Amino acid sequence: LCDYKNQTLTEELMGTGIIVCGLNGSGKSTLGKALAKKLHFHFIDNEDLYFPKTDPDYIYASPRTRKEVEKLLWSEIRAHENFVFTSVKGDYGETIYPFFQYAVLIGVPRDIRLQRVRNRSFQKFGERMQIGGDLYEQEEKFFDFVKSRPENAVEEWVQSLKCPILRIDGTKPVEENINYIMEQIQN
């Protein structure tokens, strides 16, 4: 029995929750969306919870607070018993951990991850994120944040989970990784 602010959830209500985690640029969202589609599970992306996309010119404007995100995440989990959740870490308190039946930890070399993050930014914002662009400073601060994250941060966090941890190589094709995950969760 798990009580979260007068919202009682019992194990009988739990379906299958899978957290896909890894550092920025590891391919969490891409893999998570594809995995959710393959399993016919609900997809929850931490980035979507944090950023309500109220400003069409800059999707990262007006981020929600961690408390708001936690409340939204609980709402999503209650509404969808089978889900794939993507996040760098799912560290929203130990009360959520029992809802993860599997954790998928994506590993990608740092240089590849950092390049992916820059490429993604350019795909979203184009010249606006380049020198002289109106988003240059904001995006550079984000890149510095991504670079500053300890390489072992997610590995250390995932050790606190009680579910099986599936480690995958995020440089491999998405379909290959999905096939591996499917084999592991069906056994």
Question: Which ranges hold each PLM region?
Answer:
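Conserved phosphate-donor/acceptor-positioning beta-strand/loop module used by diverse small-molecule
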Residues: 99-120
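Walker A/P-loop
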Residues: 29
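Pre-Walker A (Motif I) flank of P-loop NTPase domains
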Residues: 15-17, 81
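Conserved substrate/cofactor phosphate-moiety recognition/catalytic segment
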Residues: 33, 37-75
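Hydrophobic anchor at the beta1->P-loop junction of P-loop NTPases
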Residues: 20
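P-loop (Walker A) phosphate-binding loop of NTP-binding proteins
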Residues: 23
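ATP-binding Walker
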Residues: 26
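Small-molecule kinase domains that catalyze NTP-dependent phosphoryl transfer to phosphate-bearing small molecules
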Residues: 126-177
